[in-house]
Amino acid sequence: MAELRLSLNDQVTPELLRQIQKLQHPGKLMKGISLELLSLTEKAFEKEGDPAKWKSLAASTIKQRNKKGHWPGKMLQVSTAGLAASVQPFSSATEAGISAGSGRSAKYAAIHQFGGQAGRGKKTTIPARPYLPMRQNGSELDLTDGARKSILEMMYDYVQK
C-alpha cells in the first residue's frame, strides 16, 4: 500500500498562514489598486493621452474656449470641478475601481472616454479621448496593458510581503 506523508516545519507554517490570511482580507490591496487606477488616470489627463496623444480639439471649440479665456489649456480640464476632478477611486474588501462623472456628467465622461455623437440632435462627433486605464473590447471593458501590469505587480508584492 502506498503511503503519503506530509510534514511542515515551524518556519514554513507561520509564513503560509500569514499569506492565506492576507488573501482572506484583501481590503488593503483593493484600496491600493483603486489608487493606482486613479494615478494612471491622472497621468493620462496630464499627458493628454494614454498611450497615444488625444486628437486635437475642433477649431470651433478652441475658438469658443479662447473667447471665454480657457485657451490655451488642457483639453478635458476647463474647470477645476470638471471631468478630471470627477474621477474618484472606490474599494472594498472584494472590489477596486474608479468612477468618472455622476448624474448628468456621466454622459459627458463616457463620450470622452469612448467617443461618439453628442450635442443637440447628436450632430457633433466627439473623438475618443481615453483617460481611464481601460479600453472597450466588444461589449467588454479591459484594463490597458500598463494598468494590468501594475495591478499584477501589486498583487504579487502583496502576497510576497
Model-based region annotation:
Residues 1-161:
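Short, Lys/Arg-rich flexible segments
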